[in-house]
Every structure is written in structure tokens, then in C-alpha cells.
Amino acid sequence: MATATLTLFLGLLALTSTILSFNADARPQPSDEDLGTIIGPHQTSFDDEIGIVIGPHATVDDEDIDMDMGTTVGPQTNLNDDDLGTIIGPEFEIHKQDFPADFIFGTSVSAYQVEGAKKGSGRGLTSWDEFTHMFPEKVQQNGDGDEGVDFYTRYKDDIKLMKELNTNGFRFSISWTRILPYGTIKKGVNEEGVKFYNDLINELLANGIQPSVTLFHWESPLALEMEYGGFLNERIVEDFREFANFCFKEFGDRVKNWATFNEPSVYSVAGYSKGKKAPGRCSKWQAPKCPTGDSSEEPYIVAHNQILAHLAAVDEFRNCKKVEGGGKIGIVLVSHWFEPKDPNSSEDVKAARRSLEYQLGWFLRPLTYGQYPAEMLEDVNIRLREFTPEESEKLRKSLDFVGLNYYGAFFSTPLAKVNSSQLNYETDLRVNWTVITNNLSLPDLQTTSMGIVIYPAGLKNILKHIKDEYMDPEIYIMENGMDEIDYGTKNITEATNDYGRKEFIKSHILIMGKSIRMDKVRLKGYYIWSLMDNFEWDKGYKVRFGLYYVDYNDNMKRYIRSSGKWLSEFLDSKETLHKCYFEGHREKGYAPKLFDVEYLEPENSQLSYRSDFM
């Protein structure tokens, strides 16, 4: 490699130092007619409330990428380990044996994204079925999760892939409507769905892989959405309690790690303020094609009801004998790390802190201290629901662990102007998240295709932040991974040569080791997103995260990528980790860049770049 090219690679992350078995015969059984189909308009007013999010996308040109994705990833540079060199400064080596003996190394998926089997399996319809079929133009290339990647029928083979990776954990979600097609027990239990999850859990355990279950990963039963508006109505709390209790009693003797919700902030903001994800609600001024919604009120109502539903599920968990003997329950929150755009600006420093409170603190403060962050109480004011004294007291005891999804960082600076007549989450936040910095010592910032700065040191920082600010909880990293755009131009060999993703994973594992050793963070596990390529929500199948490449054009065959091969060797104790592109030494100012990127400026936005995760 040319010296000039290598020099370009060695430039950024200066910031990088730092869940009573039921009698099946007694259960009400739904008929096939009850389940219905998604084809054609449903004659209910709720369907008319689903808004348009993204215009038609029929090709794979750069212009088709959603503006909020921030960047597109160009041709990947062909690099070898010899090009890496070593980190100048204090040497820090990590072996698999350096992690605690009970540490979990695993992969993550969610039901709608991978399972498929929408028809003929008894599963009821979800808000995402509605979202993708009533308005296919909202999803890249008109994609949907009808087939996913056929995990429902291939799970045994996919567990073999996990074994190939030498992982000992697998995080998945349970589809509410695969168990309760209409959302409640009295309306019918789908025994085939119950059997599927029992078989999956048993197969995992038979292969030495610990299951970790998320109860809600953005799939709201369509029947409940149509009946009373889903999470817009507090009635959802008791229905979620019933669903959670069913799962604890059915699977809790074998599943010991439970999470109630995945990324409730994204579900609230993207689904009810931006209209970008199911159920696609927002104010007209936010997106003209949103037929109904209130961006100023609904995200906070939905978030509050998710917190109350979490509390109800925890109450059931604490009283369930099936989960006694080591069972834990928590929640999975997403947060970026935020640095001030200008490190010498006190206002930018405050903006970075404010961003953490609005993204992470929005849920973690009430779940730790019983109340919302002070900044939100002051600024969102009467639009933010209050907790009763009893709720606040219970909330303080409602987490056995914190699940963290971490993908990268942003630079923060205050918004110059806010329209007080058009309030939403972003105007309440009053912070611009950008990939641009005034720090001239950081010449080449590497971003992902979804517009997030790759910043492993941010993981160390946010783990330390959670330890210091939230009573030193046990933490599991439930998602961490790197995306890439599928232009449809690569052959299998090229598509599985993911050098950048390999370095991304290596760097974050190294950072985890530092966090455990140096900061004494109580980190218990690390799950990579994702085991394999899958349906990535409104980005469809165009964005890929998998350790395994899935060939959608050839019977969904799976092929291990370079990142998966490296992980397998590391977990088999054949790799010593001490050098990574994305992890460097602050004093030496490393800023490695692996991809050519083209920035796409969002249209009509107050924000320079906004992550699709919010």
C-alpha cells in the first residue's frame, strides 16, 4: 500500500482512548378466517392513519438512498493485516480468556426481520405488516418481512452457523402475534407459534448457546392498533402484561435473560414523530404524506406507556416461579455517544450532554431514579406525562441490567433556530447532530452508510457514563455492528470480504476489554448485530449488517464473511487482539478511514445529518 494512502488511514479516532404452564386444550384457538389477510385496504379508520414516509424507490442508484442515511459507502479499499501496523503508545492486548468466564459473546436478530412465515403459521398481523403492505413505497425497493430470511424454517441450520462462529449467546425477539394473533389470550393462542419458540430455545441450549429474549421489538399487534391505537392508549399496558406473563410461564424455565423493549426511543420518535417507521404517524408539517398524528404529543405518550408496560412486565417477572434461580430482566436502549462539535465551546459541551439525556436518559433516568431527566421536565413540560409516587418507587427497582445498542457517535451543537409552532422531539432537543467537527486534529472521519461516525472510544465513554450516572448496573451490549449498502454489483467473494466490518468489531471488543479492566464496568455480554443480513425496516434489504451474507437471489443461501471468520478464530482463542484501524491512541491522533464516502445533504431539514436510528 502506498505510504500516502496509509497516512490517510492513520488520522481520526484520537477520541478513541477513552424472559404455571398453560393447558393447551383450554386455550381459545383462533381460526384461519380470524387471522385474515393483509391484501387490500382494511375497512377501519386506523389504517387510514398510516402515513407515507418515503417516496417510491425502484432502483439501486445512489439517489435512492434515504437522505437520512447520511452517507453512501463507496468501493471498499483492499487492505491486509500487514497494512495495519500497531498502535503507538501503551500496548493493550486482549485475548478471549481475558473476559470473565461467564461473559456472553453472541449475535442478535429480531422476529419480523428474520422469521418470515407470515402465512400458514398462525401468526397474526402486526403494525409492520400494515406498514409495508398498505404503503410499499415507504420501504426501500418495496421490501417487507413476509419472508424475512426464512429463519422460521431454517433455525436449526442457522444455529449451526452460530456454532461455526463459536458464540455462546443468541438474542432474539418473540413476535407477540405469533403467540397471541390478536394480542390477547381470550382471542386465541397460536400453539404452532408457541411450539416454534420452545423448539428454538431447546435447540439453542442443546448447542451450548444461551437464549436472550426481547418481548417487544417494534411489532405491535395490528388488532390492538385497530381496536384502541396500540401504545397511544394506556390499555396496552395490561395487554402487554398478559403477553409477558404468558412468555415467562411458557419459556422462563429455560430463558434467564429477558428484555421488555428494544429501543423504545426509536419506536416512539420514528413511528410517531417522524412517520418513518410503523405505524408511520406524524404531524402534517413534519411530513406532508403523514395522514394523521401529532409529532409534538404522541412520541411522549407512546414512550410513557412503554415505560408503564415495562413496569407491568417486571411485576409479572418478579412473581413468576418459572424464572427463579438466576433470571434477569432489563430493557434495551440505544444511544450514540456525543462529542461537542467545538470542544472549546461551552454551548457545544452542553449540547452533547443534553443529547445524552434526551436519548439515553429519557428512559434510563426514570428506570433508575423514578423520574424523567430535568431537561425534559423543563422543556417538554406538560406534554410529558407524570409518574405517580407509587410508579416512581417501583421504577427505581425495575432493572436487573441495562441493555445498550451502540453504533457510533455524533458531534453536537445547539440548533440556531426552533419553530415554536411546530414542536416535536427534535425541536425539544434543540441540538444539531452532525458528522462535521471543528476539531482540526480530526481530518478524516469515517462514517457508516447510515451516517454515523465510527467511534469505538464512544463505547468506552458511554459505558463509563452509565456506570457513573446510573448506579453502576450490569450492562449487556445487545447490538453493535456496521452496515453497508447493497448496490447489487458484488459477487459472493466480494460481498463476503468485509474488511471494514471486521476492524469495526475488533475495535469494539478491544474497547470492551479496556472498559472492564480500566473502568471496572460491569459488562456481562456483547451481541453483534447481526448474525446474518435481514430486513432492515424502512431500508428493506438494501442495507446489510450480517456476519453471514444472505444471497436473496439464490434461495437465501448463507455465506460467512471475513468478519465472521475472524470472530470465530478470536472466540476459539486463536487470535490476540492488539491492533485495529478504528482504535487508536489520542496523543498520536490516529484517524483511520477505510471507505470513500459521499455525503448526501438532507432536504428541508434543520439538521446537518440525522441518524436513521432516531
Swiss-Prot record:
It catalyses: Hydrolysis of terminal, non-reducing beta-D-glucosyl residues with release of beta-D-glucose. Pfam families: Glyco_hydro_1. InterPro entries: Glyco_hydro_1, Glyco_hydro_1_N_CS, Glycoside_hydrolase_SF. PANTHER family: BETA-GLUCOSIDASE 33, GLYCOSYL HYDROLASE. Keywords: Disulfide bond, Glycoprotein, Glycosidase, Hydrolase, Signal. A beta-D-glucoside binds at residues 113, 217, 262-263, 407, 479, 529, 536-537, 545. Glycans are attached at residues 344, 419, 432, 439, 491. It comes from Arabidopsis thaliana (Mouse-ear cress). Belongs to the glycosyl hydrolase 1 family. This is Beta-glucosidase 33. The active site is at residues 263, 479. The keyword Hydrolase applies. GO terms for molecular function: beta-glucosidase activity.
